[in-house]
Amino acid sequence: MAKKRIAVIGAGASGLTCIKCCLEEGLEPVCFERSGDIGGLWRFQEAPEEGRASIYQSVVINTSKEMMCFSDYPIPDHYPNYMHNSQVLEYFRMYAKEFDLLKYIQFKTTVCSVKKQPDFSTSGQWQVVTECEGKQQVDVFDGVLVCTGHHTDAHLPLESFPGIEKFKGKYFHSRDYKNPVEFTGKRVIVIGIGNSGGDLAVEISHTAKQVFLSTRRGAWILNRVGKHGYPIDLLLSSRIMYYLSRICGPSLKNNYMEKQMNQRFDHEMFGLKPKHRALSQHPTVNDDLPNRIIAGLVKVKGNVKEFTETAAVFEDGSREDGIDVVIFATGYSFAFPFLEDSVKVVKNKVSLYKKVFPPNLEKPTLAIIGLIQPLGAIMPISELQGRWATQVFKGLKKLPSQSEMMAEINKAREEMAKRYVDSQRHTIQGDYIDTMEEIADLVGVRPNILPLVFTDPRLALRLLLGPCTPVQYRLQGPGKWAGARKTILTTEDRVRKPLMTRVVERDSSGGSLVTVRVLMLAVAFFAVILAYF
């Protein structure tokens, strides 16, 4: 029987891992990449490309290497915990080389349309029209994996800023920013306090005369560096923390997070504290912003009410004159124009079962991969989504009925609306552990900790108390990897390796990823469970 042919659209992080997922399931992938190279979002270019997010030269990733790596290919131990964009791209190149993925990619090939075949209701096949060097080609595929991400179109809401058309200075979207040199001696407003807005305000403040950071709601600021110098996502992404937060509820979880973030600086005193709770908005990751604010080089302002030719008037009535540049760090929107009516996007919202499958298709042969804004790393989520989707394509897994899928989609949408402030960026939110555990269940790779308590207690302890790293989903089930156990047990070694560039005497009182206090919490947790059951 001939292998099923699967079209993979995009050769960024999601596309690369989906090629590998296809190969693992015995499917034949054909990947179409509109540019001439892999990497997607993480490939820096001086000139921005339409339809693709464009990063600035200094970007450092916000998730640590142990949490963002693909599950069976750890990032080298000498790489820094938070990598520069060039190192992220290099990791993707190593991954592609290790698993021989490049030969399945057709570069400089644009996908023009993806349409159902006339017999789709029985075959589930798709007609894919592509264009390369001015020539169009039509192919038929048994399945399609869309891996174009959610940073496709710059969101520039100029209609919300009256007078911008009269402004005589320069204004542009953050996707066009590359480095701070051109802002030397200028007065700059950065609108938006997401990750890009915070980064740009900090970087530009090193050359500009003055930077103003304008925000409608304020934000909670999360450090990359957590207690004892460990990456913050390693400390927050443990199963014990996850289980306890589910028992304690959102209020206590918010209290804990806000206390942690206020320990470094008082968000109210710095003009950043929002009305909403910490977990009602995607946190802004930035280690340097409070330093620039306390030095007076960045001034936090409210929302801009209107612009004049040379000034900005804010909603609190204050005014800043002599403004030279306005940068809109207002995020991105996403669309799938090549899919026509198969997947409809309305106000940055899309109906997808588990954020992957359109519920209205007669055959589940189309999947959207990586369309999620997680509180954590996206790469391992895309990988698990790809593992699940290829199992469905192969017929190894089944989806519920359309009505059941729609009911779950609506429920998830209602829960999201209750939790998050109304914002374009919160339409595709997802918690890291929630998402990983849910999809791992569907794939059949969620670690079963209870038996390990008796057969491998050391590993069980790490799974419960340590960070919930992607490699944990290679311990058992389909795609099991022999190196998974060792990789989990040596996580802390790889965290420490790039930091130990000078030999010092190890202090036994120093911190570790699994502390005595966390161990006591685990004992208390199990005591409660035993008391109830």
UniProtKB/Swiss-Prot annotation:
UniProt EC number: 1.14.13.8, 1.6.3.1
Binding locations of FAD: G10, A11, G12, A13, S14, E33, L41, W42, N62, T63
Induction remarks: In the gastrointestinal tract, expression is induced in response to a high-fat diet.
Compartments reported by the entry: Microsome membrane; Endoplasmic reticulum membrane
UniProt-recorded name of the protein: Flavin-containing monooxygenase 5
Keyword Transit peptide: no
Name of the top EC class for this enzyme: oxidoreductase
Annotated NADP(+) binding sites: S196, G197, G198, D199
One of the record's GO molecular function terms: flavin adenine dinucleotide binding
Expression across tissues: Expressed in liver (at protein level). Expressed in the mucosal epithelium of the gastrointestinal tract.
Key words of the record: Endoplasmic reticulum, FAD, Flavoprotein, Lipid metabolism, Membrane, Methylation, Microsome, Monooxygenase, NADP, Oxidoreductase, Phosphoprotein, Transmembrane, Transmembrane helix
Taxonomic lineage from the root: Eukaryota, Metazoa, Chordata, Craniata, Vertebrata
One of the GO biological process terms: lipid metabolic process
Phosphotyrosine modification, residue list: Y56
UniProt record similarity statement: Belongs to the FMO family.
Modified residues (Phosphothreonine): T284
Record note on disruption phenotype: Mutants exhibit a lean phenotype, which is age-related, becoming apparent after 20 weeks of age. Despite greater food intake, they weigh less, store less fat in white adipose tissue (WAT), have lower plasma glucose and cholesterol concentrations and enhanced whole-body energy expenditure, due mostly to increased resting energy expenditure, with no increase in physical activity. They show a a higher rate of fatty acid oxidation in WAT. When fed a high-fat diet, they are protected against weight gain and reduction of insulin sensitivity.
Key word DNA repair present: no
Positions carrying Dimethylated arginine: R5
Positions of post-translational Phosphoserine modification: S54, S58, S280, S401
Known function: Acts as a Baeyer-Villiger monooxygenase on a broad range of substrates. Catalyzes the insertion of an oxygen atom into a carbon-carbon bond adjacent to a carbonyl, which converts ketones to esters. Active on diverse carbonyl compounds, whereas soft nucleophiles are mostly non- or poorly reactive. In contrast with other forms of FMO it is non- or poorly active on 'classical' substrates such as drugs, pesticides, and dietary components containing soft nucleophilic heteroatoms. Able to oxidize drug molecules bearing a carbonyl group on an aliphatic chain, such as nabumetone and pentoxifylline.
Main location: membrane
Residue stretches spanning the membrane: 513-533
GO cellular component, one term: cytosol
